[in-house]
Structure formats: structure tokens, C-alpha cells
């Protein structure tokens, strides 16, 4: 394979991995530990 193809696949893989981790953190098990600043300031 060419170098440009490998770089493109690597960057795409990193982007997909980061997006998956962000979605897991936002909506998966760790989301229960996140604090809600709007709930803390119940005006």
C-alpha cells in the first residue's frame, strides 16, 4: 500500500475510535458519574 493510504486509514480509525469513546462516555455506564451543572443551580 502507499503511504498516503496508510495515513488516511490510520487517521480514519483514530477518528472513529475517538467518536465511539465519546459516545460511550456520554451515554454509557460512565455517564452516571457526570455532574449536571444545570441541576446544581436550580433557580
UniProtKB/Swiss-Prot annotation:
Cell location: Plastid, Chloroplast membrane; Plastid, Etioplast membrane
Entry GO CC: chloroplast membrane; chloroplast thylakoid membrane; etioplast membrane
Membrane topology: Single-pass membrane protein
UniProt KW keywords: Chloroplast, Membrane, Plastid, Transmembrane, Transmembrane helix
Keyword Cell membrane attached: no
Domain of life assignment: Eukaryota
HAMAP family: PSII_PsbN
Family: Belongs to the PsbN family.
Function according to Swiss-Prot or TrEMBL: May play a role in photosystem I and II biogenesis.
Protein known as: Protein PsbN
Native source species: Hordeum vulgare
Organism lineage: Eukaryota, Viridiplantae, Streptophyta, Embryophyta, Tracheophyta
Amino acid at each position: 500500500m502507499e503511504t498516503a493510504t496508510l495515513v488516511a486509514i490510520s487517521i480514519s480509525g483514530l477518528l472513529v475510535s475517538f467518536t465511539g469513546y465519546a459516545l460511550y462516555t456520554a451515554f454509557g455506564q460512565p455517564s452516571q458519574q457526570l455532574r449536571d451543572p444545570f441541576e446544581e443551580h436550580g433557580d
